[in-house]
Amino acid sequence: GYRPINETQGLDFYPTPFNELAQIYDRTGSYTEYPADSKPYNDFWKEQYKRCTEGYTVGKYRITGDHYFFLNFYRMEVISEGARGGAGRNEKFPTFLAKQYEFFHYVEMAERLHKDVAILKARGIGLSEIVACLAVRPYITNRGYRSLLTCAAEGKLTPLKTKCWKQLNWLDMNTNGGMRHLRQKVNNADTKRASQVTPDGVEYGWMSEIDSVIADTSDKIRGDRVDRLIYEEAGSNKYLTKSWIKGNALVELGGYHFGTRIALGTGGDDMALEGLSNIFAKPEGYNVLPYKNYDTEDRKPQLTAFFIPAHKFSLREEFLDTRGVTQSEEFKKFYEEERKKLSGKDLLDYCAEHCFIPNEALYKQGENIFDSIAIADRLTQIRIFKAGLKPEYVSL
């Protein structure tokens, strides 16, 4: 089950056992020394597939299967601490981060309860890597599993596809065959299917698939049923609500909700946030698993979709403890200092993208026929600094 790991809970948690296999690969350049197709080799990979699908428990803490795969088999570009600007990034395994641990459990619980997933988040927290993992992991470990990646714009879908295809290629080349799947029938820029073809042209094999489509209209969310339907950059999709409703037909059969819709949106998007805002604020109306969010204007909990504020997710070691928990008060001070450097529309944009509460993330939704800069300047005083006109005593 899920045990909270945050600034006040899970103080005895130790993350090292959960990414031990990644550490072995880093030291040796290999996951296992057993010869391919030997019994120890087969037993090793059978256990890894089990952990990637059922999760992994050490002591009283458990990570989900997706999270185990992410920590031990997913490669991503990271910035080295202390590196000079322009030095580039290095490819590494992810580190354990408590907020990601919470989100992976949220996804698993939604799937167990036949609910869907929606998240509103601050910009720059690397969630696209997790989205790619949510497509790649079941492709590798589950026969016949189908994931569909959708986005309203090609420019925003291509980076996600690139991440997925890069992972598949890395696993093909670096797991000594343990996670390698041939793609002899469908292997193009938009779709990958794990299968082989007989000399007579008959397709057979693992048959898992990752497909993608540019859903710039709601009518393009159609086709064969899928197990995970991912709406990337949902906050930029002006057809999100219609696409979400039509997408239900792809994850449901005869009233049974067997698949999962996953919508991911970022604060600060212009004009098209209404759909994501509605889904976020009224999760149960859209079959989304409700999340008790304490990061609100009055600090009273609200049932929303999942929310990750900027100050509770750091990738900088100076704001992280040994458990991967962000020291939120210190990190919030960092963002507050950055906010003090800006004003007007620039401040509004910054607060929307690096939000502390959902209201900030959604400031820019809707159309505005008035002076946006003047309004932004006043709104940022009221909304961000809580400033207002102070009453004065005067003589009549």
Predicted regions and their residues:
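Conserved nucleotide-state-sensing and coupling region of NTP-binding domains
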Residues: 146-216, 285-293, 393
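Conserved RecA-like ASCE ATPase "motif II neighborhood" in helicase/translocase motors
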Residues: 188-252
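Conserved P-loop NTPase catalytic core
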Residues: 31, 198-201, 207-211, 225-229, ...
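Substrate-engagement module of ASCE P-loop NTPases
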Residues: 247-259, 264
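Catalytic P-loop NTPase motifs of RecA-like helicase/translocase cores
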Residues: 125-126, 157, 237-240, 271
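Post-Walker A helix-loop "phosphate-sensing" segment adjacent to the P-loop in P-loop NTPases
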Residues: 138-145
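Walker A/P-loop
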Residues: 112-135
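Pre-P-loop entry segment of helicase/translocase ATPase cores
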Residues: 1-116
